[in-house]
């Protein structure tokens, strides 16, 4: 694959860098004959990657974020002799869940912002962290596997999580994301026709 030729239509430098990383992972997967993964991509990057890969008819990849409606996903590039079923059996090799269980007095205190803020405050890269599923009693933080131990060790250094129980779980053990629906009635005046 000629990287420069494939990227010529993209103007933004960030887009080129993101797609260049994806091309590199796909090439490494082909030449080495093994699975390669990117860091987490945000929703824009996921959309960009999907359109780029479809346009260039590249099929040996899977976008995965830990659960069906995840916003942040990794791109898993695999050799031609692998199937998606073979990849699905190995998801736990790519992603882990760092589970934070709060104490009784801390339950309900923290939002997504608090968890993400803590990770950023520790100086850890956002690209290594996927979705953060927040619940009343804590959160499940999806991370790339090699990052799980680091996060488990560093989170208790933050005052807000010093009394929390922090464990590393398999990606299959992630809690279901709670979807809250609120009905709102809005009355809108319309212009009179008379």
Describe each region flagged by the PLM:
Residues 1-194:
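Non-catalytic terminal extensions of ATP-dependent helicases
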């Amino acid at each position: 694959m000629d990287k420069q030729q494939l990227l010529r239509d993209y103007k933004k430098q960030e887009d080129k860098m993101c797609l260049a990383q994806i091309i590199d992972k796909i090439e490494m997967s082909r030449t080495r004959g093994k699975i390669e993964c990117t860091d987490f991509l945000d929703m824009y990057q996921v959309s960009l990657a999907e359109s780029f890969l479809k346009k260039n008819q590249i099929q040996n990849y899977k976008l995965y974020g830990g659960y069906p409606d995840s916003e942040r996903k990794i791109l898993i590039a695999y050799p031609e002799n692998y199937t998606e079923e073979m990849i699905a059996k190995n998801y736990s090799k790519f992603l882990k869940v760092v589970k934070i269980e709060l104490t009784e007095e801390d339950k309900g205190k923290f939002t997504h912002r608090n968890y993400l803020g803590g990770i950023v405050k520790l100086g850890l890269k956002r690209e290594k962290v996927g979705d953060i599923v927040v619940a009343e009693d804590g959160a499940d933080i999806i991370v790339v596997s090699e990052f799980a131990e680091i996060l488990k060790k560093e989170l208790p250094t933050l005052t807000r999580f010093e009394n929390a129980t922090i464990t590393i779980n398999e990606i299959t053990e992630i809690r279901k994301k709670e979807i809250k629906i609120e009905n709102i009635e809005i009355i809108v005046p319309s212009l009179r026709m008379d």
